[in-house]
């Protein structure tokens, strides 16, 4: 079996994985004032925040190119790849996952699977890494898919944002529109649910209480097993430091990965968002 893993630019990957020849990534465009940008090509993350601050309109995103994925699958076939696993931004907040399922019929020479990751960022990157590791350990394609599904089912993320407008106006928050007029008195905690949708999980009165509640939720989640934890933020280093300190003060003794949301996810969450991702160790 020669396996390729395809993901998108919302997945947080360490440098060694970005350079791995078996991993391929599709860029997701960010549109600001009718100009199209691709992070890492013609847009740095600092440029993104500056352009977002300067614009009177909220930025938008589009889906990766279907034709680019179709062409990539053809290229992989010509290079002798026999199997492909595609892991992309959660189907609950992007239509891309639903739109690509037909491609398996277009390339019958490759055995492929596009499971819904139901997540993004660091947890998505963890899935990509694990799939590659399992393949190189000699696991069969079906065994990899079974283990991957277990990881998907036990992975989640909880989020606190400064401004719900980005999520609601972008159509990425399933049950948040009723909160828009009430943000002065509450600080909602959001989560990725079982369908990969971002939903309101709890309403907390202040940011400090919400941060403490995030730690309580995390400790409850990891009580029944071994998990990798990541703190993820969009230009909110002070909040990330505070959340890490609260975690350590609560008795959490494991390594905590800290990463930044890329431009695509920051488009939907806005500046100042803080989150933690939880992924099982399998």
Swiss-Prot record:
Matching Gene3D superfamilies: 3.30.1180.10, 3.40.50.10170
This protein's record includes keyword Ribosomal protein: no
Function noted in UniProt: May bind long-chain fatty acids, such as palmitate, and may play a role in lipid transport or fatty acid metabolism.
Domain annotation DegV: ranges: 3-280
Any one GO molecular-function label of the UniProt entry: lipid binding
Protein's name in the database: DegV domain-containing protein M6_Spy0690
PROSITE patterns xrefs: DEGV
UniProtKB keywords: Lipid-binding
Residues involved in hexadecanoate binding: 61, 94
The keyword Cell cycle is annotated on this UniProt entry: no
Pfam families, alphabetized: DegV
């Amino acid at each position: 079996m020669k396996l390729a893993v395809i993901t998108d630019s919302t997945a947080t990957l360490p440098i060694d994985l970005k350079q791995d020849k078996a991993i391929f990534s599709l860029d997701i465009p960010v549109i600001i004032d009718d100009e199209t940008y691709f992070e890492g090509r013609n847009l740095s993350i600092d440029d993104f925040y500056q352009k977002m601050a300067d614009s009177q309109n909220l930025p938008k995103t589009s889906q990766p190119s279907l034709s680019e994925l179709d062409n990539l699958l053809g290229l992989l076939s010509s290079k002798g790849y026999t199997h492909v696993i595609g892991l992309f931004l959660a189907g609950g907040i992007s239509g891309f996952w639903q739109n690509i399922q037909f491609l398996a019929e277009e390339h019958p020479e490759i055995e492929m699977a596009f499971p819904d990751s139901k997540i993004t960022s660091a947890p998505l990157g963890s899935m990509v890494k694990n799939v590659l590791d399992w393949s190189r350990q000699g696991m069969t394609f079906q065994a990899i898919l079974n283990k991957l599904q277990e990881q998907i089912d036990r992975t989640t993320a909880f989020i606190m944002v400064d401004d719900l407008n980005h999520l609601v106006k972008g159509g990425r928050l399933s049950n948040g529109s009723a909160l828009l007029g009430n943000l002065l008195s509450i600080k909602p905690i959001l989560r990725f649910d079982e369908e990969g949708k971002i939903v309101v999980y709890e309403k907390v009165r202040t940011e400090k209480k919400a941060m403490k509640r995030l730690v309580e939720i995390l400790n409850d989640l990891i009580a029944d097993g071994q998990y990798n934890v990541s703190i993820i933020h969009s230009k909110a280093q002070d909040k990330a430091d505070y959340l890490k300190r609260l975690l350590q003060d609560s008795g959490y003794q494991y390594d905590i990965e800290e990463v930044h949301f890329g431009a695509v996810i920051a488009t939907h969450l806005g500046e100042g968002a803080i989150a933690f991702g939880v992924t099982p160790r399998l």
